[in-house]
A protein has these predicted regions:
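Iron-sulfur cluster-binding electron-transfer modules in prokaryotic oxidoreductases
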Residues: 1-219
Length: 219
């Protein structure tokens, strides 16, 4: 395992678009090439960070050397569940045996909301596919934004607007539960927080839900 020296990817400050902030974000990425050249991939759990590696660094790393760095990051960076599903397909692992939905204590009916950045970079389908393959009954949202929009909804002056935008998502949850309750699953910190605070419900990350289904090994 190759871990970055920095604890933060600076995705929030890169969004500020000042030279100092952009340089800070670029410096963070320099840890990755040695890891990638050593045959490793970059596995991420936050969609906004994945979007930086697959899209944003093309703009930020403008020179020829920077473009090579961007291409390596783009081609070797994956959402955690996307990476897991690709590995399972390549090795023939059976999702229904490895992650049997019947093992989940809250039932097999899920409502899954994917992060907007997942949709942008194309990593969203893998989670839904894996969950269905495991035996879950998955209802999905089709809203573009949960209303949180990164750090937007955390700001006091935008809270009411954030909640108003989120009503479409909350309504879709209610409609999906017309036949009975569903376990809420969301990718990304902001979407997770919006659903949890807006509906006053427990919300699972996909990786968290899948981890709970693994058999407990006796050590």
């Amino acid at each position: 395992m190759c871990r970055p020296a920095s604890r933060a990817c600076n995705v929030s400050i890169v969004g500020g678009n000042t030279k100092t902030r952009i340089d800070s974000g670029i410096r963070w990425a320099t840890w990755a090439p040695p890891c990638i050249e050593d045959g490793r991939d970059v596995v991420l759990i936050e969609p906004s960070v994945l979007a930086m590696f697959r899209l944003d660094y093309r703009r930020l790393l403008a020179d020829a050397e920077g473009q090579l760095l961007f291409e390596r990051l783009r081609d070797h960076s994956f959402d955690a569940v996307e990476y897991l599903w690709a590995f399972m397909q390549g090795t023939g692992l059976d999702a229904a045996k490895l992650f049997p939905a019947s093992r989940h204590p809250l039932g097999t009916r899920l409502f899954y909301h994917s992060h907007c950045q997942q949709k942008t970079v194309g990593s969203a389908p893998a989670t839904e596919i894996l969950l269905r393959a495991a035996g879950f009954d998955v209802a999905t949202s089709n809203v573009e934004c949960c209303g949180m929009a990164g750090s937007f909804g955390y700001k006091k002056e935008y809270y009411d607007l954030s909640m108003a935008v989120g009503q479409d998502l909350f309504q879709q949850v209610a409609e999906a539960e017309s036949g009975g309750p569903r376990v809420l699953v969301a990718t990304g910190t902001s979407c997770h927080e919006q659903l949890a605070s807006g509906l006053k419900r427990q919300v699972f990350y996909p990786t968290e839900l899948l981890a709970a289904l693994l058999p407990q090994l006796e050590g």
